[in-house]
From Swiss-Prot:
Protein name: ATP synthase subunit delta
Entry similarity comment: Belongs to the ATPase delta chain family.
Keyword presence, Oxidoreductase: no
Source species: Streptococcus uberis (strain ATCC BAA-854 / 0140J)
Gene: atpH
Superkingdom of this protein's organism: Bacteria
Main localisation: membrane
Compartment(s): Cell membrane
GO cellular component: plasma membrane; proton-transporting ATP synthase complex
Coiled-coil residues: none
UniProt lineage: Bacteria, Bacillati, Bacillota, Bacilli, Lactobacillales
Membrane-topology annotation of the record: Peripheral membrane protein
SUPFAM superfamilies registered for this protein in UniProt: N-terminal domain of the delta subunit of the F1F0-ATP synthase
Molecular function GO labels: proton-transporting ATP synthase activity, rotational mechanism
Length: 178
């Protein structure tokens, strides 16, 4: 991705978030963006929009389908994206919108990777640790199961990581022996 495209993505995302703040629409925007991103991932629409194999008119029609379940501000945003033929950047724009909202509200999604599923009590403890350690509010708790970490967990939030996995501890021990 070029610097120009990154700048465009940032500008579009910031503009949408600024409108949402001005209109007191931030939480609804966040829900709309999550829904659209999930739809795009599930249908591979993100790959279709960035592919040169599809005609621009076909891409525009697919983006218009997303407007059916969205708010008026998101629909206006999608219209601007289509008018400027930037649909190939839409997926990244929406991900950047979520990052902008997180920064604005100091609320971040927390990703927890563990070898086995966490209980509700463990999830609550993870949330309280994140809130106290990083001084932020938690959004969604995204749980990932990865048996290769053997035990412990890896918490990742706002580009910061707490890794207490057995796999990392064994790796650290191995490096000390070498």
């Amino acid at each position: 991705m070029t610097k120009k495209e990154l700048a465009l993505i940032e500008q579009y995302a910031k503009s949408l978030v600024e409108v949402a703040i001005e209109k007191d629409f931030l939480n609804a925007l966040k829900e709309d963006v999550y829904a659209i991103l999930e739809t795009m991932k599930a249908s591979n629409l993100d790959k279709i929009l960035s592919s040169l194999a599809y005609a621009p008119d076909d891409k525009a029609n697919l983006v218009r389908l997303l407007k059916d379940s969205s708010s008026v501000y998101v629909n206006n945003f999608l219209d601007v994206v289509l008018q400027n033929q930037r649909e190939y950047l839409l997926f990244d724009m929406l991900k950047t919108v979520l990052k902008e909202i997180a920064q604005e509200t100091n609320t971040y999604d927390v990703t927890v990777t563990s070898a086995i599923p966490l209980t509700e009590e463990q999830k609550n403890r993870v949330i309280s640790v994140v809130m106290s350690k990083f001084g932020i509010q938690t959004g969604r708790l995204i749980e990932t199961i990865d048996a290769s970490i053997i035990g412990g967990f890896i918490i990742s939030v706002n580009n910061q990581v707490i890794d207490t996995s057995i796999k990392r501890q064994l790796h650290d021990f191995k490096m000390k022996l070498i």
